[in-house]
Amino acid sequence: MSEAVETQPPAADTVSAVKGMKKNGKQWHDNKTAFRPRANQTSWDKRTAERKALAATKAKEKELKEEKETERQRRIDAIKTKRAAKEERERFQKMEEKMHKRRVERLKRREKRNKMLKS
């Protein structure tokens, strides 16, 4: 009798895992799997920790973007002020030239008058 018991293989090894039905009953479709929502697989503490980490990274990214934008705005303002100063200088230079020309013209007219009076 002991020999008969030894020859039989254990029942647990031969039984394979039960698979779900084919989708739509067709061979080429995948097997159905058990519906297991992802929400219950991770713990609440782990999810809150992930949210905090994500919020921290987003805050850091926002801060870096703001710094970058302020630097860009500062450069733009510097360029604008330089351009405005250059335009102002050019305007004054043109005005000085005009004023000088007018003064020279006035002096020439005076000289002509004086010549006419003397002659």
UniProtKB/Swiss-Prot annotation:
UniProt entry tagged with the keyword 4Fe-4S: no
Pfam hit, one: Cgr1
A single cellular component GO annotation: nucleolus
Keywords, comma-separated and alphabetical: Coiled coil, Nucleus, Ribosome biogenesis, rRNA processing
Annotated region (Disordered), positions in chain: 21-47, 82-119
Locations listed in the record: Nucleus, Nucleolus
Comp. bias (Basic residues): 100-119
Domain of life according to the entry: Eukaryota
Major site of localization recorded for this protein: nucleus
Coiled-coil region(s): 47-105
Range of residues in the leader sequence: none
InterPro entries documented for this protein: Cgr1-like
GO biological process, one term: rRNA processing
Residue stretches of biased makeup (Basic and acidic residues): 82-99
Function: Involved in nucleolar integrity and required for processing of the pre-rRNA for the 60S ribosome subunit.
Family as reported in the entry's similarity comment: Belongs to the CGR1 family.
Protein name: rRNA-processing protein CGR1
